[in-house]
């Protein structure tokens, strides 16, 4: 039974998305339908969590908007409404859930960039 479920889910999973992890700064291009208009809305911020597996996987992106108001948005990872995901920076973190960033403001909310040797693969 599990093999049947896994094979059906495999059809709906996307393979065109780049690998990213919590702490990375990403720009998600999300298709928004307003009335009859369809437009692509970019949302840029830090990934504070990834959860789930298979087609149910989601990730949450946090950014600080105008006047210091934090905005978090949760996206289904395999949604057909996601046009593309750009990884802008790889953050150096030691946690899977970065909820502590909610209490931090300004420079305290910055994350160090994860460095890597030239030519190596970065997860």
From Swiss-Prot:
PROSITE patterns: RIBOSOMAL_L19
Record's keyword terms, sorted: Ribonucleoprotein, Ribosomal protein
Database matches in InterPro entries: Ribosomal_bL19 (IPR001857), Ribosomal_bL19_CS (IPR018257), Ribosomal_bL19_sf (IPR038657), Translation_prot_SH3-like_sf (IPR008991)
MF GO annotations: structural constituent of ribosome
Protein origin, superkingdom: Bacteria
GO cellular component annotations of the record: cytosolic large ribosomal subunit
The keyword Cytoplasm belongs to this UniProt entry's keyword annotation: no
Gene3D superfamilies in alphabetical order: 2.30.30.790
GO BP annotations listed: translation
Keyword Lyase assigned: no
NCBIfam families in UniProt: rplS_bact (TIGR01024)
Function as written in the Swiss-Prot or TrEMBL entry: This protein is located at the 30S-50S ribosomal subunit interface and may play a role in the structure and function of the aminoacyl-tRNA binding site.
Family affiliation: Belongs to the bacterial ribosomal protein bL19 family.
Protein name: Large ribosomal subunit protein bL19
């Amino acid at each position: 039974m599990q093999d049947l479920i896994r094979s059906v889910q495999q059809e709906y999973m996307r393979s065109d998305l780049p690998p990213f992890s919590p702490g990375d700064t990403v720009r998600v291009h999300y298709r928004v339908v307003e009335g009859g208009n369809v437009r692509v809305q970019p949302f840029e911020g830090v990934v504070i969590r990834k959860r789930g597996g298979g087609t149910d996987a989601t990730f949450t992106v946090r950014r600080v908007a105008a006047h210091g108001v934090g905005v978090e948005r949760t996206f289904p990872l395999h949604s057909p409404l996601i046009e593309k995901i750009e990884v802008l920076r790889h953050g150096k973190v030691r946690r899977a859930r970065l909820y502590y960033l909610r209490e931090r403001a300004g420079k305290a909310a910055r994350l160090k960039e994860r460095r890597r040797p030239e030519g190596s693969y970065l997860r």
